[in-house]
Amino acid sequence: MYAVLATGGKQYRVQEGDVIYVEKLDAEVDSTVELTEVLAVANGEGIKVGAPVVEGAKVTAKVLAQGKQKKVIVFKYKAKKDYRRKNGHRQPYTKLVIEKIEA
């Protein structure tokens, strides 16, 4: 059984036991979160596709960690004008393990 869920503006195809990295969620480490924006659910018999979400479906996940990704360097310059700007960015994320898919 797998599900397609949306969180943080992205879509993820998950099964029970999968570990995924999503955009930062407001949750404590070792707590559980319910993701209710389930776009599709598939089991052995077939697939249910929502319009836009599957009614009554939810994915339960446990928060493993909160952290920041590797630094991305943003470097702007203008040729021949002695203009240089170096900036870094680290995007926060939440690491989840999928515990249960309910449809």
Curated annotation (Swiss-Prot):
A GO molecular-function descriptor: rRNA binding
Q: What is this protein called?
A: Large ribosomal subunit protein bL21
> Is Ribosomal protein among this UniProt entry's keywords?
yes
Going by the UniProt record, its keywords in alphabetical order are:
Ribonucleoprotein, Ribosomal protein, RNA-binding, rRNA-binding
Q: How does it assemble?
A: Part of the 50S ribosomal subunit. Contacts protein L20.
The record's listing under PANTHER family reads:
50S RIBOSOMAL PROTEIN L21, LARGE RIBOSOMAL SUBUNIT PROTEIN BL21M
Gene that encodes it:
rplU
Tell me which HAMAP family the record gives.
Ribosomal_bL21
Query: What Gene Ontology cellular-component terms does the record carry?
Result: cytoplasm; ribonucleoprotein complex; ribosome
GO BP annotations listed: translation
To which species is this protein native? Clostridium botulinum (strain Alaska E43 / Type E3)
